């Protein structure tokens, strides 16, 4: 109905033969609604991640505010991320955006941390957790969010 709000988020990490596929379809069919999709993946050792997301704004769904972002952090050259973000808009008074990025750890950020004495593994962990933070921050239950951060830290530690 009118004035509805939906936030959907996901964060995942993958190793080796891991294949993770997210498919999200959000339909706006009422006035003054908001949707937010935030999906983050960290992949290593040949893992594969896929994101397929769509925001559909039907005629008459004026004042819609739709946001969709899908990002991956590839920790090696063997991993891959495939994305298909979509917007389908049939109303003229909307604010919708979507995007997808995929890349390695920022070399300048790594250099900055290393130049301040942070060991390479710890710097990688810190930058990886910072990358995932936007999705984890969408979780309102802080106890659950803290548990997820602990699991992510455990996953990062297994590489050493």
Where are these regions (language model features)?
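Conserved beta-strand/loop scaffold segments within soluble protein domains that form the structured core
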Residues: 1-118, 132, 139-160
